[in-house]
Amino acid sequence: MTSKSLNAWVIHKQWSGDTSARLKLFTRELGLINCLCKGGRTPKKQSLLQAFIPLWVSIEERYDQYYTRNIESTSSRLDLEGHSLFSGLYINELLYYTLSPDFPDPDLFDAYLFTLNGIALAREREAIEALLRRFEWALLKACGYTFSFLHEARTGELIVPDSYYQFVAGEGFILGGDKEIPGEHLLAIAADNLSESAYLKSAKFIMRQAINHLLGGREIKARSLYGPA
């Protein structure tokens, strides 16, 4: 039996029996894990086992199953409402459906924390969308699915600002095509410049296709609430 202490966020919760809860936690130390919380239905634990509360969790591993020993909040629940709330639900669903269990990625954990704090403070929808696009890119990198915004996918030639390109999921950007994106937009996105609405619109179009490819047909329910991606 081994014990670990983790920085964690609740991504999904399902009641189990009369007293317990099955949790999917996103942790800095272990990545996404499945964990059984005995006594999870008690009022104290129910108040903690919610999305958007930063947690410190002590777990033990027995026979390839994680069990919680102790759970504490490290801060109050993030104040998410409206577009911010739907966006938080969206990125939680992305983690739920795309990450393999027990595969830690501290950079992605930091990106998640940065995004949640950012959308909690954001006042404009465009600011929220820019944060979501950056998180989606961090997730794609963590899952090993990246592509170049600087080079044409089939020839390797540099993206030209005045040319137009088509995004092909699984490949990258191809010169010409039906749904064309200005090279200027690709270079701006590569430089993390989402300050103009046209650049942000192109980033949204690209990331939606890339994320859909990563999801492999699985539906993100939060999109029907807000449509952030």
Curated annotation (Swiss-Prot):
The keyword Acyltransferase does not apply. The keyword DNA damage applies. One of its GO terms (cellular component) is bacterial nucleoid. One of its GO terms (biological process) is double-strand break repair. Keywords: DNA damage, DNA recombination, DNA repair. It comes from the Bacteria. Pfam families: RecO_C, RecO_N. SUPFAM superfamilies: ArfGap/RecO-like zinc finger (SSF57863), Nucleic acid-binding proteins (SSF50249). InterPro entries: ARFGAP/RecO, DNA_rep/recomb_RecO_N, NA-bd_OB-fold, RecO, RecO_C. Coiled coil: none annotated. Belongs to the RecO family. Involved in DNA repair and RecF pathway recombination. NCBIfam families: reco. This is DNA repair protein RecO. It comes from Legionella pneumophila subsp. pneumophila (strain Philadelphia 1 / ATCC 33152 / DSM 7513). The gene is recO.
